[in-house]
């Protein structure tokens, strides 16, 4: 089965389950780390450095699996494992600030190959764009306008500061749907992280998983979610499948 056939099959399955006539895309809800920026390798280094310094045993690789969670949720996950409790408000804020500092020190701002082409394709087709990120780090978010000019209106951005529950909870993408003013069957989610793909699916959206994630594989995504090797191939293939 070709990629095109797999996409058509996924779309038909989604249409059937949602009892709609066609997949009429009006908005795209787009993750940031791992989709727009090749930044997860730096996030994992920063998380591992910070946690190791405070005596919490962990591996760098495990933070790829937490991609999409809020910083608070990630810290609480490791606190539960180490201490059997969640972190206090002051504790997690200080730890997250330290992690953010390390990310700035370690990280480089690298736009993901194909990201601009994907966004331009959306713009050309009149598809609304909403940024939905589990990050609260302004070190990358502040560059969105300069790196992707005109792609995201300021009022159409969801960050960790806008939600009470991060991915894999659907709240971030449900809020993204509100920002776009569309229902779930009129939006696609573009993700690279297992937890983000779960969140998009839970929000009821047709969710596209792209293979930039360190651990992303078919075992992590739902039946209608099709993997793509590059961002550039995503939208043209889908548009010709309706």
Please report, for each region that a protein language model flagged, where it lies by residue.
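Active-site neighborhood of HAD-like aspartate-dependent phosphohydrolases
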Residues: 3-62
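Alpha-helical substrate-recognition element adjacent to the catalytic core
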Residues: 45, 50-83, 105
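Metal-dependent phosphoesterase signature
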Residues: 13, 79-120, 125
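Anion (oxyanion) recognition and catalysis
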Residues: 52, 123, 201
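Short helix-capping segments at alpha-helix termini
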Residues: 53-56, 83-87, 148-153, 181-182
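Conserved SAM-binding loop
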Residues: 36, 129, 189-190
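Conserved phosphate-coupling serine/threonine residues in phosphotransfer and NTP-handling enzymes
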Residues: 35, 133-135
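Asp-based, Mg2+/Mn2+-dependent phosphohydrolase catalytic module
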Residues: 1-26, 120, 136-242
